[in-house]
Amino acid sequence: MINNDQQVKCVLVDPPDQISDIAKSHGATKVTEMHEVYPPLGLAYIAGTLMENGIDVSLIEARTRGLSHNDVIKEIEKEGPQFVGITAITARINSALFLARRVKEISPDIKVILGGPHIHFEHETVINNDSVDFCVRGEGEITCLNLINCVTKGGDLTSINGITFKRGDDTVVNPDRPFVKDLDTFAFPARNLFHNPAYRGLWTEGQAFSPVLSTRGCPYRCAFCAAPRIWGRKHRRRSVENVLDELEQIYREFGVRYIRFLDDLLIVNKKWTIDLCRGMAERGLDDLTWACDGRVGLVSEELLKEMKKANCIVIFYGIEFGNQRILDLCQKGFSIEQVRETIDITSTVGISSYGYFMMGYPTETIETVEDTINLAKDLGLNYGLDSAGFSIVTPFPGTPL
């Protein structure tokens, strides 16, 4: 139990990134020099919920500010929190755990909470670290709020859905928290806590930009992707009006003129997407440009024209592979011909397109990799693909890989 006379303070941390030797060899000294970087929107959502309920919150964005672990620890010491929440993807789990150990050196009484995609699947392993008090699984807003209130009041931890913790030598895995059905009930992300202006997009041309999450979940089942296993395969949407309220807030209060929708797939529902596009004009957001992820075979000329009128400037497509056997093996659910048709119609309407490609899927050969490279070239030369990015297939926790 925490002294009830004391203001409850929580510090949320996006931990330092580790720059690879390859990136360093090309002159990169921090993550913002490597690729497009976004503010930690998930932490900002949690912060918004905590602040709405009277908890004092600060947010440390170590990766984009170029902070070391020592820098982060100094800021945490200055804040003097009772709780520290650290987000972790698989690529930064070691950084997060190292930071957790350092936090406990400040004071063993600080409760350390870890969450994020890696924790969702590996919570029973991560909780065995002595420096980690709680693992939060799934959507973190309500779970973190309930957990902090429970610890503060000395309540029963087994009543908090979505957490894993240690009781002596035993690991306690509470039931999963059901997904929140009405996403409009969440507070907007606490963007006032962001350390501007460290963020940039591939298409912003120096403009301030902000990410937005308007939906959660993905109805598809790509074998390399953990998103449907974290957010569910049901596509949950905020109301159009709620999304427009947030867009208007960041447009007028923060001066943002470029939005990057971070939804796994924004355009699942055609009517909802068209209503959103038309609503932007009705709200007077005439010079607000934006980008989103699309899906091959899901867009139509009608939808793309509405998106173009609403100032959509680029759509990111997960094309992945140029070989039909590999596409089928990873359960993408579309054909090479559909790829060409989708890129062609996007270009014809006047929206730029970016293709995500991968290499190294199980059973791939030199020939299938060449198929992918050749498809990317063909799309650029003959169908209007504007840009492409290539990555190596990685078997992340929670995926069939």
Regions from the PLM with identified roles:
Residues 10, 56-58, 112, 290, ...:
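Hydrophobic anchor at the start of a short beta-strand
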Residues 125-128, 303, 363-378:
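Catalytic cores of alpha/beta
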Residues 42-182, 398:
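Glycine-rich beta-alpha loop elements in corrinoid/cobalamin-binding modules
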Residues 19-23, 168, 220, 270-271, ...:
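Flexible glycine/acidic-rich beta-alpha junction loops that bind and position SAM and/or redox cofactors
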Residues 14, 59-66, 87, 229, ...:
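Residue-level recognition of beta-strand->loop/alpha-helix junctions
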Residues 28-47:
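Short catalytic helix/loop segments, enriched in acidic residues and glycine
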